[in-house]
Amino acid sequence: MAQLPQHHVTTLILGAGAAGMMAAAHSGAGVLVIDHAKAAGEKIRISGGGRCNFTNIHCTPSAFLSENPHFAKSALSRYGPYDFLDLVNRHRISWHEKTLGQLFCDSSAKEIIAMLQAEMAEVDVELWLETSISSVRHSGDEFCVLVEKQGQAREICADH
């Protein structure tokens, strides 16, 4: 059997949705994000009727159900709605509040996608789209993923 082309990265993120792009932007160099879609952030693009309900400023840990009630408290204390709103404002995306603290883009959800992609580009995140995943395995100290990109099978291994 022929050896597959290998690619090694520090961090591999599966999925270029909101969470994947935010995680990548905060992880820094050596990050690869892969997604099967033709474009990153497809669910963001259609959310909120195309205007993206990007946060709720009244979001509190009590709004979350979990077996570990401290998880939401910990997560929101590290990065809350106002932190994301600061990011939106830094990118000069105009927004408005609808009901009960729900914030939407004035123009288009595509602005949020562009913002997240700009944040990833700023820290040299690599993005592979139209890449399908066929298997994931843990091997020693790294994770390896078998993917198909542009009709070619490859193996990507990552420390995280």
Enumerate the predicted regions with their spans:
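Short beta-strand segments that buttress and anchor functional surface loops
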Residues: 145-149
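Short beta-strand to alpha-helix junction loop
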Residues: 72-82, 99-118, 128
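Glycine-rich FAD pyrophosphate-binding loop
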Residues: 12, 28-49
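A conserved short coil-to-beta-strand element within the FAD-binding core of flavoproteins
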Residues: 129-143
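General beta-strand structural signal in soluble alpha/beta enzymes
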Residues: 34-35, 97, 127-129
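Beta1/beta-strand and adjacent pyrophosphate-binding region of the FAD-binding site
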Residues: 2-19, 32
